[in-house]
């Protein structure tokens, strides 16, 4: 695949729902058992309204978009920057909106911006910028 013969979309949107079950599964996969992510009472002691989703779980969802949708198969991340604006809590549906902001034929790559908003209230949760090799 290359930039000149691409057939991937310039924009893509997908909704992911964060669940407590996802947090438990992710803790087992990653070995990160920080109670902030797994224990509601502990999270509340720290001032949060509920358990806080793993940042790396969000990155896994970003990987789904990059590897399967925009640009898709054969894509390889070379750079990722992400900023979380608000915590993501269990039972929250998050709308991921991806758009290509730049293409380079020289490096056969794209720059991709992906933002995450709560599906219900449209609160901005994170912004990310990536360089993806095609």
Regions found by a protein language model. Name each.
Residues 1-11, 88-134:
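HotDog/MaoC-like acyl-thioester-processing domains
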Residues 1-76:
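Hot-dog-fold acyl-thioester-processing enzymes
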Residues 18, 84, 132-134:
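Hydrophobic residues in beta-strands and at strand termini
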Residues 25, 33-36, 43-45, 59, ...:
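A broad, structure-centric signal for solvent-exposed, well-ordered loop/edge residues
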Residues 37, 48-49, 61, 76-77, ...:
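Short, intrinsically disordered/low-complexity patches at protein termini
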Residues 68-92, 96:
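Mid-chain, well-packed structural core segment of small domains
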């Amino acid at each position: 695949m290359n930039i000149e013969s691409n057939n991937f979309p310039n924009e893509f949107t997908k909704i992911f729902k964060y669940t407590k079950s996802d947090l438990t599964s992710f803790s087992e996969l990653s070995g990160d058992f920080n109670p902030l992510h797994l224990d509601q009472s502990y999270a509340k002691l720290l001032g949060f309204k509920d358990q806080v989703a793993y940042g790396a779980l969000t990155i896994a969802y970003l990987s789904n978009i990059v590897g399967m949708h925009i640009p898709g198969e054969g894509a390889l991340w070379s750079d990722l920057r992400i900023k979380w604006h608000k915590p993501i809590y269990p039972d929250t549906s998050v709308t991921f909106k991806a758009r290509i902001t730049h293409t380079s034929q020289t490096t056969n790559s794209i720059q991709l911006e992906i933002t995450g908003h709560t599906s219900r209230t449209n609160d901005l949760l994170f912004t990310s910028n990536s360089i993806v090799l095609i």
